[in-house]
Amino acid sequence: MRPALRQRMQIVTKCGIKLVSPQRPGHAIKSYDTSAAHVRASVEASLRALRTDHIDLLLIHRPDALMDPRELAEVCAQLRTEGKVAHVGVSNHMPSQLALLHQHVPVVTNQIELSPLCLNALSDGTLD
């Protein structure tokens, strides 16, 4: 990517879901994974695919019931120190999940699913 073009962009990408596809033969089932190894591998893959040296906002996509907030905080801090990730956010977390994670990771945003076709966030506690 040309540096002049990159400077005019904010790159936001997600990690934390192992999708099933022909490009991912090691993923037998769709699952969530916020382990340090998976987050780091996802960031490195995004950097290569996007041909950039850093991500402006990394979103942890969907809550992971097996998440270790301290492990996630450590890898996020390392990625920030390395200059690979500027900010960390989450996607589709309930307020209690966001509060737990925020104790360990400086989360800057929570992207929620809300559209004319999906109004659940207005009544399911997401906006509490």
Regions flagged by a language model, labelled:
Residues 11, 46, 55, 88, ...:
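Conserved, mostly hydrophobic/aromatic
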Residues 24-40, 61, 66-67:
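Active-site mouth loops of central-metabolism enzymes
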Residues 47-66:
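Active-site groove signature of glycoside hydrolases
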Residues 32-51, 71, 92-100, 122:
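Short, acidic/polar
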Residues 63-128:
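Beta/alpha (TIM)-barrel catalytic core signal, keyed to glycine-rich beta->alpha loops juxtaposed to Asp/Glu
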Residues 12-30, 54, 59:
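N-terminal small/glycine-rich loop or linker at the start of catalytic domains
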Residues 7, 41, 50-53, 83, ...:
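Structured loop/turn residues at beta-strand edges in well-structured enzyme cores
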Residues 1-14, 53:
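N-terminal binding-site loop/beta-alpha segment at the start of enzyme catalytic domains
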